Amino acid sequence: MVSVQLNDNESIDKMLKRFKKKYERAGVLKEFRKKAYFVKPSIDDRLKRSRGKRRAQRANEERNS
């Protein structure tokens, strides 16, 4: 669980900004979306492989640029 304390002389906007950063880094929303519905293991593996291929292609394009 992500928690943030309000520091002395800190505005609520800054505290919210810190909370949002911690929330994103913790991957709470990403995990929630991932578990929102069931994905068969075979489809999950297929998606992981396709993501890896795209990542490798982008890395290869960056090296060649």
Swiss-Prot record:
GO molecular function, one term: structural constituent of ribosome
Any Gene Ontology CC annotation: ribonucleoprotein complex
Coiled coil: none
Chain residue ranges for the region called Disordered: 44-65
Highest taxon above the source species: Bacteria
Keyword Ribosomal protein: yes
Keywords noted in UniProt: Ribonucleoprotein, Ribosomal protein
Claim: Cell membrane is one of the keywords in the record: no
One GO BP annotation of this record: translation
Segments of skewed composition (Basic residues): 48-57
Family: Belongs to the bacterial ribosomal protein bS21 family.
Cross-referenced NCBIfam families: S21p (TIGR00030)
This protein's name: Small ribosomal subunit protein bS21
UniProt source species: Prosthecochloris aestuarii (strain DSM 271 / SK 413)
